[in-house]
Design a protein with these regions (language model features):
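ATP-dependent carboxylate-amine ligase
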Residues: 1-173
């Protein structure tokens, strides 16, 4: 027991835990008969949380696709912060970066400059169309962006179009 609570009770509580939507929620999806891990981290983004998300994505099955919307509240350093996370994604072996937003284009440019695939969508329907072209080859997809970008629309479109889904307790599983 721990703190007077039985381990069985703790295990039961942890096994019923469901992460909050948009906060590193891992979902096992089937796309055209292939398993894909989708991580919905669409609720918010800043340079530190994007780097942490990239670290998480790197641990999941490859090939990796990072769908990144603009990070908000970055002030005058917005372009450089976005370049930095694009470079970090490339340095961590993220094979494909798909961006959405005026500032996220700097992430795609830096990722592409490091000899990795980086694409920039003009709007979320175009981002979804581009992502559909990547999904047949993806092992894991992580969606991240600041709240105002509405990146959850990409997650919802993917879940709606998937052959099937299953919530996972943690992204590591």
């Amino acid at each position: 027991s721990a703190a007077g609570i039985s381990l069985a009770h703790i295990e039961a509580g942890l096994s019923s835990f469901t992460p909050v939507q948009g906060r590193s929620r891992a979902i096992g999806a089937v796309w055209q008969g292939r398993p894909i891990t989708l991580v919905d981290d669409s609720y918010n983004a800043n340079p530190d949380s994007v780097r942490a998300a990239i670290d998480l994505l790197r641990e999941l099955p490859a090939p990796h696709v990072l769908v990144l919307g603009d990070m908000g509240e970055v002030g005058e350093q917005g372009a450089s912060f976005h370049e930095e996370v694009g470079q970090y994604a490339a340095s961590q072996g993220i094979e494909h970066l798909l961006t959405l937003g005026a500032l996220a284009r700097y992430s795609a440019a830096r990722h592409s400059a490091a000899q990795h695939a980086g694409d920039r969508a003009q709007d979320w329907p175009q981002a979804w169309d581009m992502l559909q072209g990547l999904l047949p080859h993806a092992g894991s997809v992580l969606v991240k962006g600041s709240r105002f970008m509405g990146m959850e629309r990409i997650v919802q479109a993917m879940l709606h179009a998937a052959d099937g889904t299953q919530e996972r307790m943690a992204p590591c599983c």
